[in-house]
Amino acid sequence: MKTNESQINKFKKIIKQDYPDFKIESIKLLKAGWCNFVVEINKTYIFRFPKKDDVDLDLEAKILKILKGRITLEIPVYEFFGKKSSYVGYKKITGQPLTATLLKSLSLKSKQLLASDMANFLYEFHKLLPITKAKQLNLGSDNHKWRPEVIQKYVIGKLRNKKLLDFIEINLDKYLELIKDKSNLIIAYNDLHQNNIAFNKKSSRLNGIFDFGDVAVEHISIEFYRLFSFDPELATNVIKQYKKISGRKISVERVFGTAVVSIAAMLGVYNRQPNSKKYKDALNDLLRLKSLKRLG
């Protein structure tokens, strides 16, 4: 609790130094994520403070400028930029994260509309940011080799569940093939999951998408894998809808394999904390994916 208060006071001081006329009546730490601290101010603004030096907020601003006014869903409009420290601030997009319980409560029609909204966002994003813009934006690919390295070192030979280990190794082979494949490359949004969307519970539609910090040049299969660990049915429906409107060919098996490897890598990351929630969640997600009878 004291750590959170200390962080909040630090962020408040940084903002007041840069914007002395900006009145901060309330401030709350929403999330301490993998790459950013996310703070809500006055119940109206969201401020993101990067944890790492390699978070390129200028690149995000360029991408959002390209998308502004040309995309169906709401996206962040940056109003505050850090002057001495790195951060951005924008008006909060109305909506809520999509929880598993919330998704389960939706009707079949609402689930289809949700999948359509996600697919349409990706279609518009890829259309407005074709691969030809990669050089202009100085975009590269993520480092995908760390996942196999972590799995080889901390998962293979240490996981006692032989059937689960075989499942991981089969998908690891597919993943290693995928990251060598230089065909069907796109500029990927690269972070589509339940916590980066503003969901309208009343209409069962998406209001907006945020966090554009992971945009990179990737094989198209990598664009969809994060949804698989959340809900395989939703992921499959998004892929189907995307294929329909874009005409692109996407292998559900390749997306699935990437999801398996990504989750298995988390077992490696938290291998020394087998009783932690993150380790147990990763293990349960893998068992859930392994239990699927069919894809697509």
Task: Please state what every model-predicted region is.
Residues 25-142:
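ATP-binding pocket architecture of kinase catalytic cores
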Residues 6-22, 94, 112-116, 124-190, ...:
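An alpha-helical support segment within catalytic cores of ATP-dependent transferases
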Residues 113-117, 217-296:
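Helix-rich C-terminal or lid/interface subdomains of diverse kinases
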Residues 83-85, 202-204, 260:
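Short strand-connecting beta-turns/loops that link adjacent beta-strands
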Residues 8-12, 61, 236-239:
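Short, surface-exposed alpha-helical segments at coil->helix boundaries
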Residues 19, 68-71, 96, 125-133, ...:
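A general structural signal marking secondary-structure boundaries and capping sites
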